Amino acid sequence: MKIKVVTVGKLKEKYLKDGIAEYSKRISRFAKFEMIELSDEKTPDKASESENQKILEIEGQRILSKIADRDFVIVLAIEGKTFFSEEFSKQLEETSIKGFSTLTFIIGGSLGLSSSVKNRANLSVSFGRLTLPHQLMRLVLVEQIYRAFTIQQGFPYHK
């Protein structure tokens, strides 16, 4: 199995990079792992709704270019489905059983995700109603992916 995480924007904070690197290394025991950072569009101060939509579409096209036809795509969106960690683990396991060899997670930029990206998704997941910086969400996501694998393997990490 291959896990891809496609994100918009460059990660600058060392503590987040270190955490992501640690969990990426741990995930690699279970699956091939790849983090893809795409450049974000500069959003003007007090941008109009049409300017925001144009930015979303440009970023959306960049995201879609990184998704293969056979990828199972999971977008992170506040309106998505919430899971307990055990349910999330089961979802990932079932996706693999259904024959998908690549799981692609998508984290949008500060404006979110375009409708074209959301429409391409096989599943929309929410980690709750809280608003988190998308940079921090990367770390939360890779930790939960690692946790999902440890649940599947019966490791004591998840208690």
Swiss-Prot record:
Residues that span the membrane, as ranges: none
Gene3D superfamilies named among the record's database cross-references: 3.40.1280.10
Catalyzed reactions: pseudouridine(1915) in 23S rRNA + S-adenosyl-L-methionine = N(3)-methylpseudouridine(1915) in 23S rRNA + S-adenosyl-L-homocysteine + H(+)
Sample GO molecular function, one term: rRNA (pseudouridine-N3-)-methyltransferase activity
Principal EC category: transferase
Binding site for S-adenosyl-L-methionine: L76, G108, F127, G128, R129, L130, T131, L132
Superkingdom in the source lineage: Bacteria
Keyword Iron carried by entry: no
Pfam families named among the record's database cross-references: SPOUT_MTase
The entry's keywords: Cytoplasm, Methyltransferase, rRNA processing, S-adenosyl-L-methionine, Transferase
An example Gene Ontology CC term for this record: cytoplasm
Subcellular location as annotated: Cytoplasm
EC numbers: 2.1.1.177
Function description: Specifically methylates the pseudouridine at position 1915 (m3Psi1915) in 23S rRNA.
Family: Belongs to the RNA methyltransferase RlmH family.
Subunit structure: Homodimer.
UniProt protein name: Ribosomal RNA large subunit methyltransferase H
Organism this protein belongs to: Streptococcus pneumoniae serotype 4 (strain ATCC BAA-334 / TIGR4)
